[in-house]
Amino acid sequence: MLLHIPAIFTAEEVSRIRAALEQAEWADGKATAGYQSAKAKHNLQLPQDHPLAREIGEAMLQRLWNHPLFMSAALPLKVFPPLFNCYTGGGSFDFHIDNAVRDVHGGRERVRTDLSSTLFFSDPEDYDGGELVIQDTYGLQQVKLPAGDLVLYPGTSLHKVNPVTRGARYASFFWTQSLVREDSQRTLLFEMDQSIQRLTHDVPDHPSLIRLTGTYHNLLRRWSEL
């Protein structure tokens, strides 16, 4: 499942965040890539322990943990602290698959990368190229969203970032370990949850809603890993 979640941050908030990112000191993005990925990665990255990365990352996670659509789709158990990158001057990241497990806080905790997310901090008209290209069972998708919007997709997906030939593309990316590791099961639960929410709005007193909601929770109970 590939899902577009709009307006995590407002235009005014994005403007302030981007201004701060433009003034930050960036490092070579290869530092956080695996052996194979490092050969394909040509971008800049904010050091993970940078105060700005922590500040924006905490604000992002607070928004997402209170966002009904993200919670419904991701069913998050753990989230890897958001990272921040910049593509400019021809920077790109060729096709790769993210590492299956990421160490957090010096290896004291691990996160399985069931889901990948990218949150854009540059508007499409501010740069040429830079499309996030995702290849999975749903086909080849090119993603270039408005600033403040997020795309959520399976961590198993082959993906790349096209070269940025004009301007700069600022974004955040992170991984989520879901309560439900299989994408097909998460998709089924997401579609069921969205249907229950619509029915609750349209026919709030329908007697089948209780049974349908119970079925959702029984499936979640069957498939959850804690």
Curated annotation (Swiss-Prot):
GO terms for biological process: DNA damage response; intracellular iron ion homeostasis. InterPro entries: Oxoglu/Fe-dep_dioxygenase_dom, PKHD_C, PKHD_hydroxylase, Pro_4_hyd_alph, Pro_4_hyd_alph_FE2OG_OXY. Its EC number is 1.14.11.-. Residues 78-178 form the Fe2OG dioxygenase domain. Gene3D superfamilies: q2cbj1_9rhob like domain, Rabenosyn, Rab binding domain. It is an enzyme of class 1 (oxidoreductase). Its cofactor is Fe(2+); L-ascorbate. This is PKHD-type hydroxylase PA14_58580.
